[in-house]
Amino acid sequence: IMLYVGSPGILGEYYIWEQTTKQARYIASVHEAVDQLELGSFKSVKYMASDGVKLQGWLLMPRSGKPKGLVNYIHGGPHGPTIPYDYNSRMQIMAEMGYAVFAPNFRGSGGMGSGSFGDNFTRAGFTKWGTRMLDDMREGAEFVQANYEVGERVYTMGGSYGGYSSAQNMVRHNDYYDCSVIIAGFFEFDQLKNKWDGRGRAGTSDYVNTVMGTDPIELTAQSPIHNLDKIKSPIMIIHGKVDLRTPFDGAKRFVAALKKTDVDFEYHWYNHEGHGLYFNKNSSDQFKKVNRFLNSCDSRPPLNPKVASR
């Protein structure tokens, strides 16, 4: 039997289970260089939403120095939680850049049985992708700011649904986030429903309508492309040109619409990349650009210096 073992500090290792000796024999590492690095460890943070719902997230602090700010890192799905039992390159890299990174398990997260993140908790996020779920994210970040030394500025970042929410956060919570990094996101519900690669499969239409909703007024209100006038802070858009899950065409349309506004934004397209960046050179380039972008945001006055004061 071959076993795969991973952790926040180990990218991945392969073992062979020897049935005769009842021992696991090491075979190889996914990336020996990463395994030699001293990486940060995650801390569980429990907080309560403004409506009394108990929530939880994971906080990763820089290994040295005072954090330059707090990155509210939003997981994809969205109906699956962030769990720190495997290596998360984005979160570790952001921490190495000097940022505190918080990954909230907001309403709608699921995938952990019938407990805190079970089916009921998952269903609590249905049709609220751009509303209550975003409020849970902000309230988690505010709790972290109030209880940990994480700096004055707060950024929102994520991929897939995390990309969408990082765009919609700039609409719904434009008084809070200092900038946003949007990776492989979508920007309009109708466009996503009609173009994503899962359309046409048995039961998919019913599922999508159940989790996203069908009210045209609500879907428009929760679509960033229809609310560009509310975006006040800088945003960065990153997308692969052959993304079929959150189609590239949606990102292009969003950028075209942004060009007609005064929003401070930049965008980066990657050839031969799909839903996320997987070629090493592109992934490396992505984080260099993100680092530069956040450094430029760091030079701006924070939106909420009083929120971060302790």
What annotation goes with each model-predicted range?
Residues 1-63, 83, 89-92, 96:
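Non-catalytic accessory segments flanking enzyme active sites
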Residues 11-12, 24, 81-82, 112, ...:
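Glycine/Thr-rich phosphate-binding loops of Rossmann-like dinucleotide-binding domains
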Residues 19, 32-51, 55, 59, ...:
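Extracellular/periplasmic ectodomains of large secreted or surface enzymes and adhesion receptors
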Residues 65-68, 73-117:
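Short substrate-entry loop that stabilizes the transition state in hydrolases
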Residues 41, 53, 68, 150-152, ...:
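Exposed loop/turn and edge beta-strand positions of beta-sandwich/beta-sheet ligand-binding modules
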Residues 104-310:
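Active-site-proximal cap/loop segments of hydrolase catalytic domains
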Residues 14, 47, 57, 72, ...:
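Conserved hydrophobic/aromatic pocket- or pore-lining residues that grip, position, or stack substrates
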Residues 6, 73-77, 160, 240:
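Glycine-rich His-Gly loop
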